Amino acid sequence: MAEGLTPTLSGEELARYVPQLKDICTFKTTQLMNIDSTNMLPKHWLQIARCIKDAYDDFDAFIVLHGTDTMAYTAAALSYLIQNSPKPIVLTGSQQPMTGAFTDAKLNLYQAALFACDDNSYDVNVVFGGSVMCGTRACKQKTMSYNAFTSINYPLIAMIRANKIIRHSSCNQKSQEHRSALQLALSTPHAPMASECSNYKTAQEGAHSCVRFYERLNDRVMCLRLTPGLKPNIFDALTRDYDALILETFGIGGIPNSHQHNFAAALKDWIEQGKTLVLTTQVAEEGLDLGVYEVGQAFAHNEGVLRGADMTTEALLAKTMWVLGQAHTQDEIKRLFYTPINHDRVQE
């Protein structure tokens, strides 16, 4: 029986396979971990964010090489742990090993570096298969194809073709606005800090004055997909280990309300225990609207329910962990949850 693929090469070894990198940048590699991305945990997200924070003053951009299976989760998590970064933080990986005869790894790494070196790049993004996606919008949709990642409910930031970065028009406008805001920050040496960020990085005079780093996550968050026949009493088994539940509803926001499988009482009890309830849809595109059908209307105006709108499940999981890591009251939880971060939600 053939052995399955496992991570083997270090970052430095991977870079040697793409000698063209030296033509566009000088770089240093750091080996934080060498694990299959299936084994990634929230503590690893914090470790990556901390590494970037420690090196932030010394580099112009950061590239995170990551396995594809959980890369969207890590990209979303870094979007919340490192906010408003004027320096690009780019995640990439590959469907085939770097040593493969027809690998996509070389081109993905080169294009990630190309995007990271561009003056108009900032914040957390995923570069994969010639597409650039917001860290909060990337989602792995294919298991084998080289164009495995899709930007969900938000346009691509850019495409990379023939070594040229072709930016989406609306995203290019946002880039110009971001640079203008950054120039304003540069001219204001004592810009106010965000009060909710207790671990804000004290910035030097310069471009770092608007970046915010966070170092807390609450990983007691469960994501549960509704399926036909699921019993409402499942929530009783979750109360001990979880502080928040992300419930993936049917369609545009359907939650069973039949006599045998009525979820209303179970979800009401969950909220009354002081736990957080987030409703989203298990359909990837176009988002949630609880007001459309009767099976969702009971929750449409419930103040105890957080609505995922058009966010990805990966972003919802990471954001809920981040929110619960910072907030101490229900009002704070709601305020942070509904605050758009790195284009994570636009539908209301």
Model-inferred region functions:
Residues 1-185, 189, 197-348:
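Active-site histidine-anchored catalytic micro-motif
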